[in-house]
């Protein structure tokens, strides 16, 4: 007889190899066929809503690792919530207006300036939809479950109509105004930028010290002094109209040779050193406040430079006398307004100096630095020229430096509702907690929001102008434009004349002749996405405002979190979200930013093609996403190894349940052996720990708990010793069915617990599980802990056993290394435990040699009585020797009963009985 045919070895068709790149697309097809998203929504209908509102990625190009991290994190949460008593709809969105799309078309050879704006915009829309479709397929490939057939897209007419309503509501409350103000201006984009559209990079700039002669000392100065200013933007000097000093600072009049200079006393040493003064002498000092309204001369134009007081003046750098050009800086503008200065801005949209800068007209601002510096030298006003490298704002899209430039722009007044914004920040739950401080400080310090852009591809600012240039924004015009956009899309604004965009028969006292013109600027794209709480949450029946959660990268504190908060508080008085969760950026394995120049870009597509979506998802669960995270081939290799262990665990569980029918074969919990119930205690611990981790969005804790459970609790302990029972005993042996009962509970629970993270694998496992009826594991709820009367006592006792067992395993390892034994089944062990451990061992009814996976087990005396050759540990001494007897050909246990049965000479008594009773006809 072939004894191997009498062993109940694992049997399953569940494949050992994942082969995820091929298998996942087939699983996703099945999801599509069964309408998994709709089925989940149907099953959870009527439950409390949990709304995670998707911040819209920009529709341009393939998805990158940041997108993958973001969408997968969202998917974890939504999937978990739908399995724990919530209805959790997930509506994906796309941001589809703005400069990158215009640039993409220009790069493809589209001549924007040579066609009607409406025509160009149609091409932009087509391109945006192509990008949406491209990204949608890539997000689906990640296994993200969403309402992919009904996303929100910011260029869609219904969305644009709601955005117009948000604008109208803000205007009605007096929060929208037009003003001449310095804004971030990108000469390369020829448009104003919001704070969220700039990034800081190092730039080399001229650093100059310039003397301004005093023209009128107002009895405070004698008139022969010179103010010294410092600037890194010489090109702004043609726009200089004043000098700012701090009212509370002390200023020194310093004599150097025959000249007298005015600088802040605190900066005397620094300036003297920089300007290489020899024997400077402080003649006297004056308070900054005394210098107010004194007048200096512009160094190369025949005009005055007024001395003003400004709280923005610091002693961090420079001279304490600040060059002030109201057309080129926010602080300058504020001070200039206070003193009634004009807003002079001699730079055009392209960054070229105009005729208001005589002598430098036609020069690009950066190229004007040299001739202006030369002019200063020529007139004797240049005291020092050096070059410095400093952090300077750049256009985040064109990567080129930007300037501050005063232009007529539309603004949302943040000042008007700043206190409500700060209150809303306070009422929101922030994860990580520092998010609150970050957004609070941004809101506290930010200026008014410049919402106009001088571009073609965006939502028009719905303003009309009367014959006297008065802007017209009324409920009637706003509602009419919103309805037009809802019906025709915003392109109608560029296709029709102003009169055809106004309500029929519309009149206005400022237009007696009935003539009107329309605004040509469009809205900042942050106003687009920032209106989604109104256009999506409020509008869709399956969603609600405020959302439970916004989850984006940490760059969105100044972006979407901020713009959404601003529009929502302006319109509703409340934040659009109850909670905000942010994640870090994805870096390479060495912690460097990914860039084409370094060649270290990791793309999601490549990972999914080579390893599979579930490996990428498992990586997302493994990282501390609230900080910046790392990815590399080596890191992915480690994750793939963890995946292999999880998959092998599923395969082992399925294989050993091939002949198990839960309805007929399950053993009642009360009839399970202690060790089996202990395994259920460990399973309960896992269920509790994993669910708590999901609740707190701590996915790394989920990852580690599941990995440890599979490798330590199952593979290294329970499954290891269970093989001797599962394979060797008769099919219906009580102990075997008891173990199968536990394995079944473990399998079902584990499959559900991994579903949010490994949905493909979980749904691949699910149909193999005996007795399941649901079409997909996604249509089930998270497991509940199994009720056990003696759970706590079991845990205490068996945790102690596990501690002692680890000592035994160490002793066996030592004996193996010393060639006392081969495999552990060739060993006999005698334990000499502490009194406490002895009592515990004596109370165990299970076969201890099975639990230790040895052939013979004896309990000796106390730890003090152990022989010299025993291995001594904290809780026991262990004597390891060769087991007596022969090796059984069927179970490989060494036993003195081998040969006792005359028919089965090579089997131990246990195996001979099993074979006779079950396999002999």
Curated annotation (Swiss-Prot):
This protein's UniProt keywords: Aminoacyl-tRNA synthetase, ATP-binding, Cytoplasm, Ligase, Metal-binding, Nucleotide-binding, Protein biosynthesis, Zinc
Gene Ontology MF terms in the entry: aminoacyl-tRNA deacylase activity; ATP binding; isoleucine-tRNA ligase activity; tRNA binding; zinc ion binding
Keyword Ribosomal protein: no
Cofactor: Zn(2+)
Binding locations of ATP: 596
Motif 'KMSKS' region, chain ranges: 593-597
Motif 'HIGH' region per UniProt: ranges: 57-67
Cellular component terms (Gene Ontology): cytosol
Binding-site residues, Zn(2+): 888, 891, 908, 911
Reaction(s) this enzyme catalyzes, per UniProt: tRNA(Ile) + L-isoleucine + ATP = L-isoleucyl-tRNA(Ile) + AMP + diphosphate
Binding positions for L-isoleucyl-5'-AMP per the UniProt entry: 552
EC number(s) from the headed UniProt entry: 6.1.1.5
Domain of life: Bacteria
Entry domain remark: IleRS has two distinct active sites: one for aminoacylation and one for editing. The misactivated valine is translocated from the active site to the editing site, which sterically excludes the correctly activated isoleucine. The single editing site contains two valyl binding pockets, one specific for each substrate (Val-AMP or Val-tRNA(Ile)).
Family label: Belongs to the class-I aminoacyl-tRNA synthetase family. IleS type 1 subfamily.
Known function: Catalyzes the attachment of isoleucine to tRNA(Ile). As IleRS can inadvertently accommodate and process structurally similar amino acids such as valine, to avoid such errors it has two additional distinct tRNA(Ile)-dependent editing activities. One activity is designated as 'pretransfer' editing and involves the hydrolysis of activated Val-AMP. The other activity is designated 'posttransfer' editing and involves deacylation of mischarged Val-tRNA(Ile).
Official protein name in the record: Isoleucine--tRNA ligase
């Amino acid at each position: 007889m072939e004894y191997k045919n009498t062993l109940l070895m694992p049997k399953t068709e569940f494949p050992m190899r994942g082969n995820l790149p091929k298998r996942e697309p087939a699983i996703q097809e099945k999801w599509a066929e069964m309408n998994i998203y709709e089925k989940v929504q149907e099953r959870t209908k009527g439950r409390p809503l949990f709304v995670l509102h998707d911040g819209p990625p920009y529709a341009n190009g393939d998805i990158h690792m940041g997108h993958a991290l973001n969408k997968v994190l969202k998917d974890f949460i939504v999937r978990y919530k739908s399995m724990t008593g919530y209805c959790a709809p997930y509506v994906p969105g796309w941001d589809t207006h703005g400069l990158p799309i215009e640039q993409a078309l220009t790069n493809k050879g589209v001549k924007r300036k040579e066609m009607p704006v409406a025509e160009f915009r149609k091409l932009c829309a087509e391109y945006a939809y192509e990008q949406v479709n491209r990204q949608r397929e890539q997000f689906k490939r990640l296994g993200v479950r969403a309402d992919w057939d009904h996303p929100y897209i910011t260029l869609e007419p219904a969305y644009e109509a709601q955005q117009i309503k948000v604008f109208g509501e803000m205007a009605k409350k007096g929060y929208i105004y037009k003003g001449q103000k310095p804004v971030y201006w990108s000469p390369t984009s020829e448009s104003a930028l919001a704070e969220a559209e700039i990034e800081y990079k190092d730039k080399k700039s001229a650093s100059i010290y310039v003397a301004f002669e005093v023209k009128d000392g107002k009895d405070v100065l004698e008139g022969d002094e010179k103010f010294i200013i410092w600037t890194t933007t010489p090109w702004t000097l043609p726009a200089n109209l004043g000098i700012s000093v701090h009212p509370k600072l002390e200023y020194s009049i310093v004599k150097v040779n025959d000249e007298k200079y005015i600088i802040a006393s605190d900066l005397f040493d620094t300036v003297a050193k920089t300007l290489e003064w020899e024997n400077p002498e402080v003649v006297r000092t004056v308070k900054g406040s005394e210098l107010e309204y004194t007048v200096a001369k512009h160094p190369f134009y025949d005009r005055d430079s007024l001395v003003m007081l400004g709280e923005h003046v610091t002693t961090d750098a420079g001279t304490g006398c600040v060059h002030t050009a109201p057309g080129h800086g926010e602080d300058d503008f504020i001070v200039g307004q206070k003193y009634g200065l004009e807003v002079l801005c001699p730079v055009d949209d392209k960054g070229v100096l105009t005729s208001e800068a005589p002598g430098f007209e036609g020069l690009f601002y950066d190229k004007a630095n040299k001739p202006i510096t030369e002019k200063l030298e020529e007139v004797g006003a240049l005291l020092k020229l050096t070059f410095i490298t400093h952090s300077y704002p750049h256009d985040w899209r064109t990567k080129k430096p930007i300037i501050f430039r005063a232009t007529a722009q539309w603004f949302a007044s943040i000042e008007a509702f700043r206190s409500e914004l700060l209150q809303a920040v306070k009422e929101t739950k922030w994860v990580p907690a520092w998010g609150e401080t970050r957004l609070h400080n941004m809101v506290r310090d930010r200026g008014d929001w410049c919402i106009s852009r001088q571009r073609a591809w965006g939502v028009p600012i719905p303003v009309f102008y009367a014959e006297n240039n008065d802007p017209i924004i009324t409920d009637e015009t706003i509602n009419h434009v919103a309805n037009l956009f809802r019906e025709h899309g915003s392109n109608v604004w560029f296709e029709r004349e102003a009169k055809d965009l106004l309500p029929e028969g519309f009149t206005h006292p400022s237009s007696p002749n009935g003539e009107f013109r329309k605004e040509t600027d469009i809205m900042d794209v942050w106003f687009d996405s920032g209106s989604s709480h109104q256009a999506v949450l409020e509008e869709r029946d399956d969603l609600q405002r405020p959302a439970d959660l916004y989850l984006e990268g940490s760059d969105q504190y100044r972006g979407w979190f901020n713009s959404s908060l601003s529009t929502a508080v302006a319109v509703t008085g409340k934040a659009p979200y109850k909670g905000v969760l942010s994640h870090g950026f994805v870096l390479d394995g060495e912690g460097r930013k990914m860039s084409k120049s370094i060649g270290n870009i990791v793309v999601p597509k490549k990972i999914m093609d080579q390893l599979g979506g579930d490996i990428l998802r498992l990586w997302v669960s493994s990282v501390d996403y609230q900080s910046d995270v790392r990815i590399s081939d080596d890191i992915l290799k480690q994750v793939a190894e963890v995946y292999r262990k999880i998959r092998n665990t599923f395969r082992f569980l399925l294989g050993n349940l091939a002949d198990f029918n839960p309805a007929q074969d399950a053993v009642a919990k009360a009839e399970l052996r202690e060790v089996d119930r202990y395994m259920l205690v460990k399973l309960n611990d896992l269920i509790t720990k994993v669910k708590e981790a999901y609740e707190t969005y701590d996915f790394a804790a989920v990852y580690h708990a599941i990995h440890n459970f599979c490798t330590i609790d199952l593979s290294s302990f329970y499954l290891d010793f269970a093989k001797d029972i599962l394979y060797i005993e008769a099919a219906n042996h009580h102990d075997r069915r008891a173990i199968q009962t536990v394995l079944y509970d473990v399998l079902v629970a584990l499959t559900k617990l991994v579903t949010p993270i490994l949905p493909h694998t979980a749904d691949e496992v699910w149909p193999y599980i005996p007795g399941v009826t649901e079409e997909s594991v996604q249509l089930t709820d998270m497991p509940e802990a199994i009720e056990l009367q003696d759970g706590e006592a079991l845990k205490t006792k068996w945790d102690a056993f596990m501690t002692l067992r680890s000592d035994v395993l160490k002793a066996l390892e030592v004996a193996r290394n010393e060639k006392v034994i081969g495999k552990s089944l060739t060993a006999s062990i005698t334990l000499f435990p502490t009194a406490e451990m002895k009592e515990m061992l004596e109370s165990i009814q299970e076969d201890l040699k099975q639990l230790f996976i040895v052939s013979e087990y004896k309990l000796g005396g106390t730890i003090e009585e152990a022989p010299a050759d025993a291995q001594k540990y904290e809780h026991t001494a262990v004597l390891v020797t060769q087991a007596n007897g022969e090796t059984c050909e069927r179970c490989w246990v060494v036993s003195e009963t081998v040969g006792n049965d005359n028919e089965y000479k090579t089997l131990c008594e246990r195996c001979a009985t099993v074979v006779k009773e079950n396999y002999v006809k």
